[in-house]
A protein has these predicted regions:
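"A position-specific structural signal for the A-helix of alpha-solenoid helical repeats
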Residues: 27, 64-65, 99
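TPR/TPR-like (Sel1-like) alpha-helical repeat modules
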Residues: 45-50, 76-95, 101
Length: 108
């Protein structure tokens, strides 16, 4: 079992606890993303966004990484919607501004 697989197993175990579920879900999604399992990352991140309490300010990492997972699946319009949602909360978040620019100018 590789390090990412071990991390995934630990994040999945941690999700059983009620505290810290937003960050744990984000890290689990990123781990699947890093493994190239974009559809699974999408499912994890989307489920967390839809089911966990909190606003976009609390879920900004989940929203950004869902955009990344969608973009990696070449679902550019959907990715753009999530990037713009993240941009509305924090214009300086990682490379979200560059990603929005690329997707809106067709420079994928």
């Amino acid at each position: 079992m590789g390090l990412l697989d071990e991390a995934i197993a630990q994040f999945q175990k941690a999700l059983r606890a009620p505290e810290g579920r937003l960050k744990t879900s984000e890290q689990l999604g990123i781990s699947f993303f890093d493994k190239g399992r974009f559809a699974i990352a999408e499912a994890v991140l989307r489920r967390a966004i839809e089911s966990l309490a909190g606003g976009d300010e609390d879920k900004i990492g989940l929203i950004y990484w869902l955009g990344r997972a969608l973009e990696s699946q070449r679902r550019f319009e959907e990715a753009l919607r999530f990037y713009e949602r993240a941009l509305a909360v924090d214009i300086r978040l990682l490379d979200v501004g560059d990603r929005v620019h690329r997707l809106t100018t067709g420079a994928q």
